[in-house]
């Protein structure tokens, strides 16, 4: 299980990304639209002044239950260990053991 501080840090980043998403997208669009170099530089400075953690690139997928960062399945939001256990217990609808 991941440290609680790491899980909370990721949640904080997710909140920041959602909070600044529209502002960040608007600035990026303005940068794309403008042709003047000085205006582009000033817009880049505004973009850089936003909090670092408000960028979606800094998010890392983590298991919802354990907080494990590796072996993450996007479809379920779980790590491979938890996914396997929940599938064996029948807690995931539509998931069954494969046999061929």
UniProtKB/Swiss-Prot annotation:
Binds 16S rRNA, required for the assembly of 30S particles. Part of the 30S ribosomal subunit. This is Small ribosomal subunit protein uS14c. PANTHER family: 30S RIBOSOMAL PROTEIN S14, SMALL RIBOSOMAL SUBUNIT PROTEIN US14M. HAMAP family: Ribosomal_uS14_1. Belongs to the universal ribosomal protein uS14 family. GO terms for biological process: translation.
